[in-house]
Amino acid sequence: MTLFHFGNCFALAYFPYFITYKCSGLSEYNAFWRCVQAGATYLCVQLCKMLFLATFFPTWEGAAGAYDFIGEFMKATVDLADLLGLHLVMSRNAGKGEYKIMVAAMGWATAELVMSRCLPLWVGARGIEFDWKYIQMSIDSNISLVHYMAVAALVWMWTRYDLPTHYRLPVTVLLGLSMYKAFLMDCFVHMFIMGSWTALLLKAVITGVLSLSCLTLFVSLVHGN
């Protein structure tokens, strides 16, 4: 039963990535090693972020249950490095915009999945007692994939030299929302004392709205040109 539960969690977390890679056409472009390079860039960026946070934002010691809004906001600002990393990955790849976006998003999201969820699933999902948090973790990995696709598309649009002026503001706003999404989620969860499933649903809704808005801008920009 424990192995069956682990298999379900593993399939729920990893198969959408495999299906996306196959159905997006990346496999036809032999983009596997490009995705690996994007994943390696993700690791370097996260290492730099950890060193920066450990140096300039040490652990805040406040009252029990208190939430340091200003400190967490400043820490969320460090996620700007992710946007720079995605831009670096896309700038090093030649090809159409769709190809650059998919390579960067797949490599980035897969690296995050392997580094942050592989070990917890292997250790926890094989435990004797069933726990919903591993199902939630697997679902959250799919939300992260959609999130990074939207962010990569926004970064690609924002860095275009021929981006029309009237696109600049909405793209910038969406980039800001994507960067501070985790911080806003933590604020909502803390203020309204949300349960884990409610928080996951809220994250899915916010990511969906962000992604649909990004898709609308991307399609209108590409077909407009």
From Swiss-Prot:
Stretches that traverse the bilayer: 1-21, 35-58, 69-90, 101-126, 132-157, 167-189, 197-218
Cited InterPro entries: TMEM147
Location(s) in or outside the cell: Endoplasmic reticulum membrane; Cell membrane
Cytoplasmic topological intervals: 22-34, 91-100, 158-166, 219-225
Entry keyword set: Cell membrane, Endoplasmic reticulum, Membrane, Transmembrane, Transmembrane helix
Residue spans, topological domain Lumenal: 59-68, 127-131, 190-196
Assembly mode: Component of the multi-pass translocon (MPT) complex.
Family: Belongs to the TMEM147 family.
Protein name, UniProt field: BOS complex subunit TMEM147
